């Protein structure tokens, strides 16, 4: 795996629906509408499914149901599906997908023979025309005297005229940039914006897009600083730690700091909005937390806010191992209770770390500085997912920062069933045909993989890894066949192996089912 791929995975990723979980086909296809005449866009309409890599197989799907499939003699980059005049019989939400052919003669699993679904394209056959999509790029905030941002508007129909409106202001704004089906509007002032489009000068504007809110921020918002690998591991031969700083937009310069002191460490930038630092642990002269910040092109006199701090810990294992004890006893603990893990050393003024055994790594899950000879770590509202082997370690708070070996492991056993997450439906009533049904799964611990499961089915319908305690899950293209009861669950990301219970179900009812 490349370093850039590792960074992108570290900052969060989302897997597609169940029929594409094992696919790595590049990019999803594009579906666009090509009317015979923009004066009467619904009189004779053709849908074009275009893909980056040539293929022989194209499939058109309407309202979540398969509609048409073509198999060609030779691979092409696009295929045209003629709908003709739009009536109640062929109006709806369309998507397409394309067949994937491996570069060598291998047998793919059936579900891996397709690309992801294309963008959704709404065909109504009436006016006003369906709304475009809109979003802020690269961020949804501006600073006084700072760089503007764009509002990007898109509709899957070429040749239209885009208009932007600001709430409370008469008149419209024309695009500053436009390419294929997307238009960009430069935004210098905060406010609520929406865009629409015209197919011809005498036509009616389309339905407006969803509101895009641009806020004013006093300073550039902070970047995120994270440890490569998600968890901190300690072993005596370790000499370097890797930190990644990511800004919310492209930056001219980054700084890695301890307190107010800028560290003289040259970073490597895989992208314009990120820098990776290799920190030599042997060259550090203090244990202060690390932060990072950035500044923008043309605004080099203004630094962003600092990131949240990241603490490091390391050990040469030259000092005696501490002793770890549990209060109450580590066996037969009750769910929902609190357990105290006491780490005791032979000297005072140390930094202590609580470690948990993964597979195969022993990782640091908490750190505490102590002026005495011990530190007390607390695990609150414990459940079966906290069961496992724990140990502790310490290091001196002054150079040369010698440290101990890990204590003898202590096993925690928590009784009871695994905790259940909570699944929340982010819509009301019935789900319209061809639209998305978006859920939020609320768990108990960060760094997990969450799954959307349906009653009676073994394969998840959606998966998402998250560094927080919740994640968005969805049915991306709802048809009548999606009516049913859905739940969520989560499993630990490596190196841990716990699994939650199943949430209470949420019923999905689809219009027309």
Swiss-Prot record:
Residues 22-126, 127-219, 220-312, 313-415, 416-513 form the Ig-like V-type domain. Residues 1-20 form the signal peptide. InterPro entries: A1B_glyco/leuk_Ig-like_rcpt, Ig-like_dom, Ig-like_dom_sf, Ig-like_fold, Ig-like_Receptors_ImmuneReg, Ig_sub. The keyword Signal applies. The gene is A1bg. Glycans are attached at residues 44, 89, 192, 369, 381, 389, 485. The keyword ATP-binding does not apply. Transmembrane segments: none annotated. This is Alpha-1B-glycoprotein. Interacts with CRISP3. Keywords: Disulfide bond, Glycoprotein, Immunoglobulin domain, Repeat, Secreted, Signal. It comes from the Eukaryota.
